[in-house]
Amino acid sequence: MINHPEIIVIFPAAGIGKRMGYKYPKQYIKIKNKTILEHSISLFIDKIYVKKILIAINKKDYWFNKLSILKNKKINIVIGGKSRTESVISALKFVSKVDWVLVHDAVRPCLHKNDLNKLLKVINISPFGAILAAPIYDTVKKSYGNFISHTIKRNKLWRALTPQLFNLKILINCLKIITSKGEIITDESSALEKCGYKLNLVHGRSDNIKITYPEDLNFANFFINNIKE
């Protein structure tokens, strides 16, 4: 068994996800009789080192209370904000007595336990944190309107995945600085980058996909059925 210090896991889950075309947020779409959110949470619930799981939901969320996972004592609900950053900040207000936090996408249900273990090992070598990431193998184009501007060299490009691991005090401080400047970020590691911190990249599996479009459901269903252990 791998030993880790106690951590708290945050799920920003206040988004609406209108691109999926459903009448309810995409985290509540079911795959194998469980919602995407439940699949995303499942890997963390039974971990001894996970002290608490904070789920930031929309104040108009009528679906979460129907989930059976709410009965688990580790699960705590907080009201999220209009943006991902606001939701994470809301959850951080309820974090105490730990040095490390994980932030994981509510609609990333295919996380593999080996990737999680690799990420947590960074606690032993970095005082700041790390993110799971996957190298980009596709050719990447910079656009100018609807035209190609130029091709970007991909040898140093990575796709940021989640979960992302952070020293609690550093994350809180960096988010405070970024929001005070009115800057918009799309993940928490960007806040630390802008504050000058160097985070480790941990090579993660490419099947750790984020559900964004309807076609992603087919991939997630395949991975959950055949790959996830």
UniProtKB/Swiss-Prot annotation:
Family matches, as Pfam families: IspD (PF01128)
Site residues, Positions MEP for the nucleophilic attack: 154, 210
Pathway(s) served: Isoprenoid biosynthesis; isopentenyl diphosphate biosynthesis via DXP pathway; isopentenyl diphosphate from 1-deoxy-D-xylulose 5-phosphate: step 2/6
Residues with site note (Transition state stabilizer): 19, 26
Enzyme Commission designation: 2.7.7.60
Catalytic activity: 2-C-methyl-D-erythritol 4-phosphate + CTP + H(+) = 4-CDP-2-C-methyl-D-erythritol + diphosphate
Gene3D superfamilies for the chain: Spore Coat Polysaccharide Biosynthesis Protein SpsA, Chain A
Keyword line: Isoprene biosynthesis, Nucleotidyltransferase, Transferase
InterPro entries: IspD, IspD/TarI, IspD/TarI_cytidylyltransf_bact, ISPD_synthase_CS, Nucleotide-diphossugar_trans
Biological process annotations from GO: isopentenyl diphosphate biosynthetic process, methylerythritol 4-phosphate pathway
Single GO MF annotation: 2-C-methyl-D-erythritol 4-phosphate cytidylyltransferase activity
Quaternary structure note: Homodimer.
NCBIfam families: ispD
Function: Catalyzes the formation of 4-diphosphocytidyl-2-C-methyl-D-erythritol from CTP and 2-C-methyl-D-erythritol 4-phosphate (MEP).
Family of this protein: Belongs to the IspD/TarI cytidylyltransferase family. IspD subfamily.
Protein name, entry field: 2-C-methyl-D-erythritol 4-phosphate cytidylyltransferase
